[in-house]
Curated annotation (Swiss-Prot):
Matches recorded under PANTHER family: PROTEIN DPCD (PTHR31921:SF1)
GO cellular component terms, semicolon-separated: extracellular region
Signal peptide: none
Name of the protein this chain belongs to: Protein DPCD
Length: 203
């Protein structure tokens, strides 16, 4: 089963864990050289950040690509392309999951709720957002469902609008909830260093 396949690849990855600033940071190194880093709230186990990095054909490390969480703020760490700020007036697309849902926030969208049309495009396996006034259009996939090879179900999709922010939620299928619970059990086995311990060692 595909869900098991992704879970097994997470189990097989080399993992290091670090507790810092109320966050449990987990780094995964997969056999193919791909890296994934996740940050969880230490108290709630809620996923705050997930990002990926792959090596180029020449073996150089690429930039981290953020899948979940806020992009790094200017001045935080070394300067890089990911620190170029967007205009405050442009719509800003950020994924922030909850325990029970995948969730996306699109800021700087001032139009009333009835202007938005949010639906699943089954052919392209993505979620589409469009406005009846043709001011905004976006489509995005849900990588988690791709990894678990689960279908998109429009009945699990909902959206709300408040404070110029469109909030799109996709209820996590039970297969994903079970897999995430299994992963948390797995992560408890990883020796966790504390930020005062220096570099954490790979398990």
């Amino acid at each position: 089963m595909a869900v098991t396949g992704w879970l097994e690849s997470l189990r097989a990855a080399e993992k290091t864990a670090l507790l810092q600033d109320g966050r449990r940071k987990v780094h995964y190194l997969f056999p193919n050289g791909k890296e994934m880093a996740e940050e969880y709230d230490e108290k709630t186990n809620e996923l705050l950040v997930r990002k990926w990095r792959v090596k180029s054909a020449l073996g150089a490390l690429g930039q981290w690509q953020i899948e979940v969480g806020e992009p790094a703020l200017p001045g935080a760490g070394s300067l890089g392309p990911e620190l170029i700020t967007e205009s405050n007036a442009n719509p800003i697309f950020v994924r922030k999951d909850t325990k029970m849902s995948f969730q996306w926030r699109i800021r700087n969208l001032p139009y009333p709720k009835d202007v938005y049309n949010v639906f699943v495009d089954q052919k392209e396996r993505c979620v589409v957002v469009r406005t009846t006034n043709k001011k905004y259009y976006k489509k995005f996939s849900i990588p988690d469902l791709e990894r678990y090879q689960l279908p998109l179900d429009e009945s699990l999709l909902s959206f709300a609008h408040a404070n110029s922010t469109l909030i799109i939620s996709y209820q996590k299928p039970k297969e994903v909830l079970v897999a995430e619970s299994e992963l948390q059990k797995e992560l408890k086995k990883v020796k966790t260093a504390h930020s005062s311990d220096g570099d954490c060692k790979t398990q």
